[in-house]
From Swiss-Prot:
Name of the encoding gene: E7
Biological classification of the source: Viruses, Monodnaviria, Shotokuvirae, Cossaviricota, Papovaviricetes
Top-level taxon in the UniProt lineage: Viruses
Transport keyword on record: no
UniProt motif LXCXE motif: location: 24-28
GO molecular function annotations of the record: DNA binding; DNA-binding transcription factor activity; protein domain specific binding; zinc ion binding
Domain free text: The E7 terminal domain is an intrinsically disordered domain, whose flexibility and conformational transitions confer target adaptability to the oncoprotein. It allows adaptation to a variety of protein targets and exposes the PEST degradation sequence that regulates its turnover in the cell.
SUPFAM superfamilies in UniProt: E7 C-terminal domain-like (SSF161234)
Name listed for the protein in its UniProt record: Protein E7
Species: Human papillomavirus 17
């Protein structure tokens, strides 16, 4: 810069000296241990006690389910799906 005031060419020259190209490619390699894998949801054992839809006897089921899975099962058993005990199943088979 020559003189007391900066001129446009002086400013542009200074900016070009500050700007440096940046390599945006990442050449880092991850080991197999570091690669992210989706963890399978944890399955927890649940005991379900529900009545037979015909005679009312208690039926016991043990299931392995995720939190979302057991909620879905609960909705089904309280709604559209009903359980039948072995004795009532035999009666249904013969009718």
């Amino acid at each position: 810069m020559i003189g007391k005031e900066a001129t446009i060419p002086d400013i542009v020259l200074e900016l070009q000296q500050l700007v440096q190209p940046t390599d945006l490619h990442c050449y880092e390699e991850l080991s197999e241990e570091e690669t992210e894998t989706e963890e399978e949801p944890r399955r927890i054992p649940y005991k379900i006690v529900a009545p037979c839809c015909f005679c009312g006897s208690k039926l016991r089921l043990i299931v392995l389910a995720t939190h979302a899975g057991i909620r879905s099962q609960e909705e089904l058993l309280l709604g559209e799906v009903q359980l039948v005990c072995p004795n009532c199943r035999e009666k249904l088979r013969h009718d």
